[in-house]
Amino acid sequence: MSYLVETGKNEDAKKITNDIEFINSTLLLSQGKSWIENNQYYRFQEVFSCKNYNDVIAEFLFLISNLYSSDDNFEKSNFYLNLSSFLNPKFKFNLSLIIENHYFNKDYNKAKKILKNLKKEDKFYYWFRLKKEAQIISKERNDKESLNFIVSNFKRINQPNKKFLFDLANFYKKSKEYKNAIDYYTKIIDELDDESDVKSDILYRRGASYERIKDYEKADRDFLEALEINPGDAYTLNYLAYSWLERDYKIDKAMDMLKIAYEAESDDPYIIDSIGWAYFLTRDYLKAEKFLKQAVELMPEDPIVNDHYGDILWMLDRKIQARYFWNNVLQMKEAEKELIEKINIKMIEGLKNS
């Protein structure tokens, strides 16, 4: 985009941005699309010039920094970021990656200090700032204060775009306010074209929210529509199949879907857990143990996985080990009240009908 704008090919730049969806685009692409939509072409040259060798080298170093960051090598990532910023100090958007690196290193004070450099005039980067501040509040305090912060700031935004609606819906979903999440996912879906690349993902997220409030009819409808758009999506197949297993509904069909999901994403711990649980429900406890053991090794802090593994161990007459894993769940902060109540009963009575 920068090259097209700098060479006066604004209409070509517009054509490119027409195909960009805010929801699934990078931060920089979204900000560039926003500038073009608002005829702020001059903003590109304020931060980058294709004719400036330092700017071009700085961009290359920024890409290297991204690669190191994606491998969790934050020290090397910051090294290349500092070089990039030295060569092109105008490109303040490097700061977003520096902030992410500090955040993942749990250095929240440094992250908060740098976040203040992102101003309202660049609305996508400012929204990134608000989201990251909310995430830090969640880490340092709690999810409720985090949600209140992002909601109050969202209300001040004039004509929020679909990306902002999407992010707010995700905040509501993370905070288990599923009805509010559904409202915002629905607003997005109502605005999307049928050919939109992101529609299946939004349907999946809304379906998951419906499932959490036990509105299974609407949940199934969303999951199935998402699968019509993207038939091989492993995560939608997994979520729908697991929901059916929990409801003792279409067990054979659920197993078939899980096998497809597992073939596509055999390293995903949630899918491994689901297929293990499917074998448990079909009373193939040896196969179930194989998968659930792997899942609990990959996610030792997940309460559902530990509960499932405990159930399988019980059915294999390894009752002391079963109680050990159930007891683990009782110590986990993420364990929901309903699960804790069930495990307290199992700790005393064991598995019923075993």
Give each language-model segment a name.
Residues 17, 81, 115, 150-154, ...:
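Hydrophobic/aromatic packing residues within the alpha-helices of TPR/SEL1-like helical repeat arrays
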Residues 23, 87, 118-123, 156-157, ...:
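Structural marker of alpha-solenoid helical repeat scaffolds
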Residues 2, 66, 100, 135, ...:
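Residue-level recognition of tetratricopeptide repeat
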Residues 32, 63, 97, 132, ...:
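Canonical tetratricopeptide repeat
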Residues 29-30, 60, 94, 128-129, ...:
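TPR alpha-solenoid repeat register
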Residues 13, 77, 111, 146-147, ...:
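Single-residue signature of alpha-solenoid repeat helices
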Residues 45-60, 193-196, 200:
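TPR-adjacent "capping" and linker segments in tetratricopeptide-repeat scaffold/adaptor proteins
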